[in-house]
Amino acid sequence: MAVQKYTMALFLAVALVAGPAAPTPPTPRTPPLLPPPRARDKATLTSRSVEDINAASRRPWWASVPPADKFKTFADHVLCVPNADVTSAATKAPQLKAKLDAAYRVAYEAAEGSTPEAKYDAFIAALTEALRVIAGAFEVHAVKPATEEVVADPVGELQIVDKIDAAFKIAATAANSAPANDKFTVFEGAFNKAIKESTAGAYETYKFIPSLEAAVKQAYGATVARAPEVKYAVFEAGLTKAITAMSEAQKVAKPPLSPQPPQVLPLAAGGAATVAAASDVRVCRSHGTLQDACLLRCRGGCQPVVWRGGSHRARGGYKV
């Protein structure tokens, strides 16, 4: 489950970053080239997704689909078809299916093409390449060196996201002060150096490192802007979204704690009610609502009243 979960998180990340790649026209009349059953059984979830993508663009009826309907047809025949692998994984990670669908659509929307068909071809090329990068990156027990193998928790998988995030921040900081024409060169050098340093002696044993570095370079080369500063800005924004998606995917969703009502104790000897104070509440003086919920209405100009003992509407709360 862990490998599937983080594989698909990275799948979404690379789909976000890959953007428009050099389109490789599919061959519609070529019969699907699927591996023999035994090899397919052993393939990872991501590898099978690669096969499904490629097979969909090679089916005989594909040539007769109007260009404007390419993506809708693809969505109907691939995205909406029940997939036992995805369904099984989604039962263990509820957000998986939504992230998978989002990855397809983000990659498609980011694709560039003068015609709907050309745009679809660019989408297929970008998404297939992204899936291939991931297929070689996160295979069972091939992600991290044996010294980092764990049984209960995918520590290595979590750590690498943090390392990528840290390396990105270091590289972006270094690139910001570089001349426009040198920004990506500076970024690439700093990024690779930071990754090597953060993984220390284990760098060579991380099989996905070369693919990661290649994906970074490909993402930069795929941007359509001509001006170096604009091209770098587009690349940096895409990679930032990717790392954010990876970081969010690795967080364990926890339901927010529901506020506890204040406890009103019996009257003390002096006649005053003793309140077991919860957290103080800041209320907008003008509108009587919680200050956090009133920031837009007051545009940050709230004059808060602090209520002790929980909610300002609860019995026992009082102003100060």
Curated annotation (Swiss-Prot):
Disulphide bonds in the chain: none
Residues making up the signal peptide according to the UniProt record: 1-23
Superkingdom of origin organism: Eukaryota
Keywords: Allergen, Signal
One family name in Pfam for this protein: Pollen_allerg_2
Start-end of Pro residues biased regions: 22-37
Disordered: annotated span: 21-45
InterPro entries, per the entry: Poa_pIX/Phl_pVI, Pollen_allergen/Os
Keyword Signal: yes
Family note: Belongs to the Poa p IX/Phl p VI allergen family.
Name listed for the protein in its UniProt record: Major pollen allergen Pha a 5.1
Provenance organism: Phalaris aquatica
